[in-house]
Amino acid sequence: KKKITSKTKAIIPVHIAGYSENLSEIYKFAKKKNLRVIEDAAHAFGSKYKKKLIGSFGDIACFSFDGIKNITSGEGGCLVSRDKKIIKNAKDIRLLGVKNDTEKRYSGHRSWITDVEQQGWRYHMSDINAAIGIAQFKRFKNLSKKRRLLCKVYDERFKYSKIISYFDIDYNITCPHI
């Protein structure tokens, strides 16, 4: 709270290892200060806070689908928001500012003719990575069940360790990132 200035535009809570931040307090403070909240949910895909999935609370949430995350597409990620203006802006800049819709590539549209209305970046994933991600979504329930089981084994094996400490985990709401 001490770091907030008149230049601050957003708060970015980072959910580490599947654990959520205290989102109620963060959103209450953000609303009071008229700030956006951008959740970094790269480690928390499948985790919950107050019975709702992480990433479903506020302005923007970002997920990573890198090879070591809870769900993978090899590389890439996802930005989610209920704000149509944010989504439109993200779509406008995701492919180096090129405005053509992805669907037009396969509809006979002359895909070599492009409109660039603003500077953009390469924020899109390849079709191959997207296909891998879709397949992983279908397997997520089983993958997260195995991940939770593995974590319980680690918890049991290390619970008496004098050099390793760990969080007290509620596996009903946490999808651990290990």
Summary of predicted features, one role per range:
Residues 1-73, 78-88:
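Active-site phosphate-binding strand-loop segment of PLP-dependent enzymes
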Residues 10-14, 19-25, 32, 48, ...:
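PLP-dependent aminotransferase class I/II
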